[in-house]
Every structure is written in C-alpha cells, then in structure tokens.
Regions:
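Ubiquitin-like/PB1-type beta-grasp interaction modules and other compact soluble beta-rich domains
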Residues: 1-68
Length: 69
C-alpha cells in the first residue's frame, strides 16, 4: 500500500483489507501518546485509530508533540 506521510510517499506492507490507521502508525514506529494525526485533511481522534481504514493514496500528516520550557 502507498500512502503519503508528511508529504513523502511511503510504501507500507499492510493488507488492504485490514489496513488500520493504528497498525500503520505502529508499523512506522510512531508512539500514540506523542502525536496528532490528520488523515485527508481531517484530524482523527486517537480513540478512533483502531477503526479507521486506510486506502491506497491516503494523505497523512503526523505532528509530534514535544514538551519544553
């Protein structure tokens, strides 16, 4: 499956039928407690990541939350 992540095309080895957002994020090494995810211009609540299916060509924007002071 090909998806665009932060403007870069990525190929992820996921079965199209079972390609969930949570699985893709885990596969790419993202930690769920430290990111905000936008899928095709919509912010996706982390409580829904398990239910959201990805499709070939989807656009993800992933923003990491960093603390500081």
């Amino acid at each position: 499956m090909k998806i665009n992540v932060n403007g870069e095309e990525k190929r992820i080895e996921l079965d199209q039928e079972n390609a969930r957002l949570s699985t893709a994020l885990n596969h790419m090494g993202y930690k769920p407690n430290t990111i905000i995810v936008e899928l095709n211009n919509l912010i996706i609540n982390s409580m829904k990541w398990e239910k959201v299916k990805l499709k070939d060509g989807d656009n993800l924007e992933i923003v990491s939350i960093v603390g500081g002071g």
